[in-house]
Amino acid sequence: NLDAKLRVHMRAEIGALHKRIGVTTVYVTHDQVEAMTMADRVVIMQGGVIQQIAAPDELFNNPANLFVAGFIGSPGMNFLNAELRNGALTLFGQTVTMPKARAHEGNFVVGLRPEHLTLGDAPVMFNVRPTLVESLGSEKYVYFDDGGARVADGEEGKSKGLIARVSHTGSLAGDEALPLGFDPAQLYLFD
C-alpha cells in the first residue's frame, strides 16, 4: 500500500518498463486508475462476468453498460432516471432535446460525468444549492441534491446526490445558488 506520490511514480516506472521490454503482460488490479493509466486494453468484470473489453479511452467514452459507466471515472458518473419522449428528456426542470436519435423512446437511466457539468454558460443551464464544496486547488467537487431530477438508485439501492467536478480556482460559497450547465451531446442513455 504505497502513498499517493509513490504510487504515481511506480505506475510511470512500471509503464515505462512494460514498453521497453515489449512483452504482453496481464496485470490484475481493483484500482481503476492503475488500469486506465497502465493498460493498452482493459477487461472490466463484475461477479466473474466480463462486462467490457476495450482501450481505456473507449471504456471512458463508450461504456457498454451502467456498471462500466459507474466504475470508470473519478468521481463516478451521475445517474438520473428520465423518460425520453419526442426526442427530449426533462432533467433539472429543463427540457433537453437529445442530439442523437434513439431507436425507441421510454424510460432510461441518463449518465452525466461530473466533469461534463460546468459553471456558467452551457446549452442547458440550471441552478443548484451545494450541500458540500470540496476544494482541490485547481478544481472543486460540488455536491448537490437532485432538485427533483429523480436520481437513479446507487449500488446499495439508496438514492444518492449528484456531483460536479469544475475547474475553478476562486472560492465558491456553499450556501449560494450556483449556475451549472451541460451539453446534451455529453449525456449517456442506458436502457
Predicted ranges, named:
Residues 1-67:
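ABC ATPase nucleotide-binding domains
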Residues 9, 62, 70-71, 120, ...:
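Residues that scaffold the ATP/ADP-binding catalytic core of kinase and kinase-like folds
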Residues 15, 41, 50, 56, ...:
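Generic alpha-helical hydrophobic packing signal
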Residues 55, 67, 81-83, 127-131:
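Residues located in well-ordered beta-strands
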Residues 57, 66-70, 106, 115:
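Internal, well-ordered alpha-helical scaffold/interface segments
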Residues 62-85, 111:
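C-terminal boundary and immediately downstream tail of ABC-type ATPase nucleotide-binding domains
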Residues 75-77, 86-191:
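Non-catalytic connector elements of ABC transporters
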